[in-house]
UniProtKB/Swiss-Prot annotation:
UniProtKB keywords: ATP-binding, Cytoplasm, Ligase, Nucleotide-binding, Purine biosynthesis
Organism listed in the record: Prochlorococcus marinus (strain MIT 9312)
PANTHER family per UniProt: TRIFUNCTIONAL PURINE BIOSYNTHETIC PROTEIN ADENOSINE-3, TRIFUNCTIONAL PURINE BIOSYNTHETIC PROTEIN ADENOSINE-3-RELATED
Designated name of the protein: Phosphoribosylformylglycinamidine cyclo-ligase
Gene: purM
Pathway the protein takes part in: Purine metabolism; IMP biosynthesis via de novo pathway; 5-amino-1-(5-phospho-D-ribosyl)imidazole from N(2)-formyl-N(1)-(5-phospho-D-ribosyl)glycinamide: step 2/2
One GO process term, biological-process aspect: adenine biosynthetic process
Catalyzed chemical reaction(s): 2-formamido-N(1)-(5-O-phospho-beta-D-ribosyl)acetamidine + ATP = 5-amino-1-(5-phospho-beta-D-ribosyl)imidazole + ADP + phosphate + H(+)
EC number, UniProt record: 6.3.3.1
Length: 347
């Protein structure tokens, strides 16, 4: 018996590395010192551009969205999801992404599938001037089934310590600007999959009420907000805090970037919740609180700013084809504001 007989094909792994080389190296900036194939990725940190450079790291996956995406052959899209989930986290403190690493684990190496995944990762990186510096593809027979894979991503960025965005400058009456999501993004899919299991004709019913393809809408890749945030900051517009709206929705994620003596007042009438979310709520009979604490409901990212910058930010978002709007404001925390300003769903 040899390694291949036991389920690990070393030669197929070598061929896969060769096939992804063009996509990976297409993301490399001038700071990448060497190509793929070494034991470690080498990256020259652009310290000359910063007074006190601070590295910022983030890691994430795509969750159980992978199960549904793999069954519908949305492999390229989940590659973008992987980059988005990591990159959107690290940019909240003002960091510019430098490089990305990926980890792919599978029961049996399907080069056609995983090439699409890596192409998606490369696309997400390339669109955001972030080098795909390296990765690992692990063939694990008996641990994963042959037609399944899992993904993890790791993103590293850089910011000047004096320009860190941490919410400490937030004050009363600052505005909260919402940036529209691309759909469900990569959270809540354990609930989504259960709803699908319990409703055989869900895709046809959705198409009937929306005239949209259910799985095309459901599996849209997570929006990456790096470029729009980077432009806002490059125009010397102060952002006091940012929040990536992921698992836990607005109620869980927005308060994370706000000092404890303030709370966010969210005007829930300031936007129309997209039809996909309403459809899932109806078909899954999801309670209101769970609805808000599971999905982003059309809000993928939030900025907290002084009101003087509102129009400039909305215009920049428009230039990037991202819908944005004033979703609320910051109020000082006390018993009266909690009962007066926060809707019941957010308490």
């Amino acid at each position: 018996m040899d390694y291949k007989t036991s389920g690990v094909d070393i030669e197929a792994g070598r061929e896969f590395v060769s096939e992804i080389k063009q996509a990976v190296e297409g993301t490399h900036t001038s700071n990448v010192i060497d190509g793929i194939g070494g034991f470690g990725g080498l990256f020259r940190i652009p310290v000359d551009s910063f007074k006190k450079p601070v590295l910022v790291s983030g890691t994430d996956g795509v969750g159980t969205k992978l199960e549904l995406a793999q069954s519908k052959n949305f492999h390229f899209e989940v590659g973008i999801d992987l980059v988005a989930m990591c990159m959107n986290d690290i940019i909240t403190c003002g960091a510019k992404p430098l490089f990305f690493l990926d980890y792919i684990a599978t029961g049996k190496l399907d080069k056609k599938q995983l090439l699409q995944v890596v192409q998606g990762i490369s696309h997400g990186c390339g669109e955001n001037n972030c080098s795909l510096l390296g990765g690992e593809t692990a063939e694990m027979p008996g641990f994963y089934s042959n037609n399944k894979y899992d993904l993890a991503g790791f993103c590293v960025g850089i910011v000047d310590e004096d320009k860190l965005i941490n919410g400490k400058k937030i004050s009363e009456n600052d505005l909260i600007i919402a940036l529209k999501s691309n759909g469900v993004h990569s959270n809540g899919f354990s609930l989504v999959r259960k709803i699908i299991q319990n409703n055989n004709q869900l895709d046809k019913e959705f198409e009937k009420v929306s005239h949209l393809n259910f799985y095309d809408e459901l599996l849209k890749p997570t929006k990456i907000y790096n470029n729009v945030v980077n432009q806002i900051l490059s125009e010397n517009i102060e952002i006091k805090a940012m929040s990536h709206i992921t698992g836990g929705g607005i109620p869980e994620n927005l308060p994370r970037c706000i000092p404890s003596d303030f709370i966010p007042y969210i005007n829930t009438n300031s936007w129309e919740i997209p039809i996909l979310f309403k459809f899932l709520k109806e078909k899954g009979t999801i309670p209101e609180k769970d609805f808000w604490n599971t999905f982003n409901l059309g809000v993928g990212f939030c900025l907290i700013i002084d009101k003087q910058f509102k129009d400039s930010i909305l215009n920049i978002c428009k230039d990037h084809d991202i819908d944005s709007w004033e979703i609320g404001k910051i109020v000082r925390k006390n018993d009266s504001t909690i009962s007066k300003f926060l809707p019941e769903i957010l308490t």
